[in-house]
Amino acid sequence: SGGTESINAVHASVRSLWPESRELVITGTEHAAVLESAKRWRKQGGKVVRAPVHADGRVDLDALREIVRPGVTALVSIMWANNETGVLAPMREIVEIAHAAGALVHTDAVQAAGKVPVDVKSVPVDFLSLSGHKMHAPKGVGALYVSKRVRFEPFLIGGGQENERRSGTENITPSRPPRP
């Protein structure tokens, strides 16, 4: 889906642009797209650290403060709303912890968008993934918010579409059926 692609794009971009900061921080309760992308991060020589969660599924912020380290942690990638439990992550606090250490923040907001307030001005994440089918758009459509504060290396390169962030011809529905 578009959400899965955007998660992979963020992880690949950060891994490529900040190779000296080797660590990706996630939780064990992330969506499979994050967990599988983390496996790739590890295969490419990076380290993946799992932040613990409390019994109710909330991220342990005290442990996160100890895990996220300046010059070591490149990216903290934690979902805003859990797709299985509905637990909401304290994203504002996660952003504060990560940014204080110089790390970037990605959130999978697929389950949160449209259900709880998601505002990148009040919660200044660096990357935010969305999936259209959760908002009545066609399946496979997604969106990736990239803050103007950060660099981004495109996952797909080619024709430079989407302001050179995702190349490829857009899949559009014709306004009328093709003629025979």
Where in this protein do the model-derived segments appear?
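Pyridoxal 5′-phosphate
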Residues: 1-180
